[in-house]
């Protein structure tokens, strides 16, 4: 196993990051959450104290098996849940204390796909991202239409504008959902398993777009994913969770270590350097020989 490599500060950006990258956008300090308490009054923690910071232009991937606390943490970052200890701050504002419209102008949460309640065309769906800026239920001001159009252009979906949402392919729909989030003009993008149901080509296209959005528009992007190797290739930092605890946070080459990953994912693993210089995780069979990495791509 080899985990050697250069530091990934600013990795994925083709060199040193711009000076403003050092500006902290998201600050999480000793944040924890419990969904309920036992009969004796003891809290049952879904997430223990977690601390990390993320800056402009950065992509941070949150990794961990099922029930590790990933979705709970994402809701804390979005301000949907309030931590029972510590804090979550976006641009120095407490996320859970922001009025809903103000919060929606700072953070956009892209959750796993849900069914539409009624038919919508793509432009109507993306226009919903402008709701935090309006005073009426329906928004069709010139500014709103312009921002919705810009959001579609950012994800390469301008040609989909008049299509019905239920007629889109998985990859097309994922781009449009991302466009609706961008129409909010947030500084922080939160995505829950955005590559789910996409083929490998669709996954790579989506992650390249996220990388470009972070680089060119100063977004901070937080991605919950189970795709270890894709996360390694596109992320600046990795947060590894297990059973509600944060085990490691740092560049992929600091986190992708066999002794850390094997107990978390309960599988025999090898870690090697890919041609890109990023860590690559491979399963080992019963004889210790590496399997194809198709199951961890």
Identify what each model region corresponds to.
Residues 63-65:
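The feature captures the beta-strand-to-loop junction immediately N-terminal to the Walker
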Residues 78:
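Helix-to-loop junction immediately C-terminal to a conserved catalytic motif
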Residues 86-94, 103:
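Conserved ABC transporter NBD signature motif
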Residues 164-168, 172:
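Conserved ABC ATPase signature
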Residues 185:
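Conserved catalytic motifs of ABC-family nucleotide-binding domains
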Residues 189-193:
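Catalytic Walker B motif of ABC-type/P-loop ATPase nucleotide-binding domains
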Residues 264-297:
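ABC ATPase nucleotide-binding domains
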């Amino acid at each position: 196993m080899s985990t050697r490599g250069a530091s990934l500060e600013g990795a994925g950006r083709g060199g040193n990051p711009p000076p403003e990258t050092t500006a902290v956008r998201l600050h999480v300090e000793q944040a924890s959450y419990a969904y309920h308490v036992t009969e004796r009054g003891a809290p049952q923690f879904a997430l223990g104290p977690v601390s990390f910071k993320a800056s402009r232009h950065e992509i941070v991937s949150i990794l961990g098996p099922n029930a590790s606390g990933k979705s709970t943490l994402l809701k804390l970052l979005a301000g949907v849940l309030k931590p029972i200890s510590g804090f979550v701050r976006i641009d120095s504002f407490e996320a859970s204390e922001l009025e809903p419209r103000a919060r929606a102008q700072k953070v956009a949460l892209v959750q796993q796909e849900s069914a539409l309640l009624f038919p919508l065309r793509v432009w109507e769906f993306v226009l919903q991202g402008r709701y935090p800026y309006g005073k009426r239920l329906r928004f069709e001001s010139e500014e709103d239409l312009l921002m919705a159009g810009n959001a579609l252009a950012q994800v390469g979906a301008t040609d989909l504008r008049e299509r019905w949402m239920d007629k889109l392919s998985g990859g097309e729909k994922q781009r449009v959902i991302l466009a609706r989030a961008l129409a909010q003009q947030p500084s922080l993008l939160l995505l829950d398993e955005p590559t789910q149901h996409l083929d490998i080509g669709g996954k790579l296209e989506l992650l390249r777009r996220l990388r470009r959005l972070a680089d060119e528009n100063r977004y901070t992007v937080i991605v919950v994913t189970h795709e270890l190797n894709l996360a390694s290739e596109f992320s600046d930092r990795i947060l590894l969770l297990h059973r509600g605890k944060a085990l490691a946070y740092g560049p992929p080459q600091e986190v992708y270590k066999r002794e850390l990953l094997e107990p978390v994912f309960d599988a025999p693993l090898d870690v090697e350097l890919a041609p890109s210089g990023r860590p690559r995780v491979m399963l080992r069979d019963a004889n210790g020989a590496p399997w194809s990495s198709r199951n961890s791509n």
